[in-house]
């Protein structure tokens, strides 16, 4: 990957999507070390850009994750993301989504959550995750409007399914309760401070 373009041979387009939308960036986030991490869903690539040099310092391209969303660097330096599992033509109809934490020094998984059976947790688009200060992970299974929290041991602490159905601008998802992403905020966090009822 060069500074101003992606080599299509090195980072090929996912075979399930149209060429007209080669990359489909769905995450651009600042890391704790001030670098920037970007995720391109349609070619299964995430990359970290050095804030000072503007050069790519790390990348991962792996179709096994079936496209992904909400890529983020954790305080421990690992990378957390929602692996959609969208490529059923490769992985088979009995696979599903997962939330994955990898060590970017070797791109090895250090933690993951998936459904049991695998198809009990699946969202082929949107969705996200957040590592909480408790060590638990908040998960948004966007396709089904499901929010839930799991412990490091992968036990579900609580879950919520949105009862709100809306018209979505896609013929396959009209009249659904999809949720793009979710976040948990402390009551005194700057995002919601002074907005909560007394």
Language-model features, listed with the residues they occupy:
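Histidine-/acidic-rich catalytic cores in large beta-rich domains
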Residues: 1-198
């Amino acid at each position: 990957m060069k500074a101003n373009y992606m080599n299509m041979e090195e980072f090929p387009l996912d075979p399930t999507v149209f060429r007209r939308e080669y990359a489909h960036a769905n995450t651009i986030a600042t890391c704790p070390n001030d670098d920037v991490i970007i995720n391109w869903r349609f070619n299964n690539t995430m990359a970290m850009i050095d804030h000072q040099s503007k050069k790519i310092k790390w990348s991962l391209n792996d179709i096994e994750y079936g496209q992904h969303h909400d890529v983020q660097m954790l305080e421990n330096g690992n990378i957390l993301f929602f692996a959609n599992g969208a490529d059923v033509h490769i992985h088979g109809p009995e696979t599903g989504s997962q939330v994955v934490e990898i060590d970017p020094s070797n791109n090895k998984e250090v933690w993951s959550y998936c459904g049991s059976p695998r198809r009990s947790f699946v969202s082929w688009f949107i969705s996200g995750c957040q590592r909480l200060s408790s060590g638990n992970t908040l998960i948004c299974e966007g396709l089904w409007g499901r929010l839930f929290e799991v412990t490091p041991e992968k036990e579900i602490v609580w879950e919520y399914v949105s009862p709100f159905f809306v018209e979505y601008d896609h013929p396959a998802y009209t009249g659904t309760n999809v949720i793009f992403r979710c976040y948990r905020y402390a009551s005194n966090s700057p995002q919601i401070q002074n907005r909560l009822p007394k």
